[in-house]
Amino acid sequence: LTSSAAVVAASTFSLAEAQSGRTPAAGPFAVRAGEGRPGGQWLVHGEKVFTTKVSGADVGKTFAIIEVHTPPGLGPELHVHPAQNELIFVLKGSIGLQCGSDRTILRAGDAFMAPLNVPHAYVTLGTEPAHMLHLFNPAGDMEGFFADYAPLVSVDGEPDHQKLAEVSEKHGVKVVGPPLMASSFAS
């Protein structure tokens, strides 16, 4: 984690811990670059795209941090998390982001928090993949979501959007619209 992301993660846990009285399930640990927590790496077209850096199981389900690499021109469908906030911290590249009716461009070093129940989506801009950390608070079942989601988007051609919506719903994510188009963001 970058120092900024580590501070965000530590702050979020401290706040959640204070509010809930829960304590972490795991002791201190380090997760090296290119590695993830056990069972927490998912491939799309043979590339490591989703990597769990901090599992909800590690911290009493108070939060989870997933490292995400998204190719140019791609991103998730417009969706809501009915029971979670999602913080996106851009490490490399740039994304066009919509949250509610607000639209903005985030670049390396920028962060954005999408509150629970607010529709949001992003699309990678430019010619390079976006490299991000997504922090979910509370953790919910986001690791289960990514485990089920990765094989569905790892197909040649267009993925089955009905199946993506079903997997999303199963894991507490509600799809409410199509993915964003990179062309709709002026760089």
Tell me the role of every PLM-derived stretch.
Residues 101-117:
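Short acidic-glycine-tyrosine-enriched beta hairpin
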Residues 39-78, 84:
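A short glycine-rich, His/Asp/Glu-containing loop-to-beta-strand
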Residues 19-27:
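Cleaved targeting-peptide boundary
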Residues 67-71, 80-97, 135-137:
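Short, conserved beta-strand element in jelly-roll/cupin
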Residues 1-20:
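N-terminal export signals
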Residues 148-187:
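Acidic/histidine-enriched, glycine/proline-rich intrinsically disordered or flexible terminal extensions
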